[in-house]
């Protein structure tokens, strides 16, 4: 494993921890898109169906379990434990517009036409756009709490680092996965506007807001 993947995983874990602690400590999921979290749960569930059949390393298996467990823990807190604080009125993105196209694309463009491979490919495509409901929600409300901004920034850094991971693997291992690279580029581009606002506002102590 190279340093970019490791740092990407650390950034991803940091984002998850920030989100879970934010909800649990504040006893509120205000400002968090339940729809984005549902999409992430679908992503990790479909990607890691090989959890108990394909062992690569203890690290790999542990990370898979953490991602799956944390995604469902987040959903439980949003839709059950702290349901009264969930801002469903602003979380209105039509997720079917993300799920259906990515599912169709996974059937058409994949590495191998087998159930597990199609589901893995679907998870890659869906993850690239899963943050859209959250960004849409921030845009609709006009602002985001600082802690939510930190969560989004950590997620964006995770994806950017994974792009460097693919470059490193191509350079030193000769490994090239066009599907993962293109999806990663799409996801990183979606964060670009947010990155700019985060650096120019949040890091200067101001509240982040996206143009409506």
From Swiss-Prot:
One Pfam family of this chain: ER_lumen_recept
Cytoplasmic face residues: 25-32, 80-92, 136-149, 200-212
- The protein's site described by Important for recycling of cargo proteins with the sequence motif K-D-E-L from the Golgi to the endoplasmic reticulum is found at 193
Cytoplasm as UniProt keyword? no
| Record PROSITE patterns | ER_LUMEN_RECEPTOR_1, ER_LUMEN_RECEPTOR_2
Q: Give the keywords, sorted.
A: Cytoplasmic vesicle, Endoplasmic reticulum, ER-Golgi transport, Golgi apparatus, Membrane, Protein transport, Receptor, Transmembrane, Transmembrane helix, Transport
Q: Where is this site: Interaction with the K-D-E-L motif on target proteins?
A: 5, 117
Sequence segments annotated as region (Interaction with the K-D-E-L motif on target proteins) = 47-48, 159-169
Question: Which parts of the sequence are annotated with region: Important for recycling of cargo proteins with the sequence motif K-D-E-L from the Golgi to the endoplasmic reticulum?
Answer: 204-207
| Transmembrane annotation, as ranges | 5-24, 33-52, 59-79, 93-110, 117-135, 150-168, 179-199
- All ranges on the Lumenal side of the membrane: 1-4, 53-58, 111-116, 169-178
Mainly resides where?
Golgi
Q: Which GO terms describe its cellular component?
A: COPI-coated vesicle membrane; endoplasmic reticulum membrane; endoplasmic reticulum-Golgi intermediate compartment membrane; Golgi membrane
Q: What does this protein do?
A: Receptor for the C-terminal sequence motif K-D-E-L that is present on endoplasmic reticulum resident proteins and that mediates their recycling from the Golgi back to the endoplasmic reticulum.
Official protein name in the record: ER lumen protein-retaining receptor 1
Q: What is the scientific name of the source organism?
A: Xenopus tropicalis
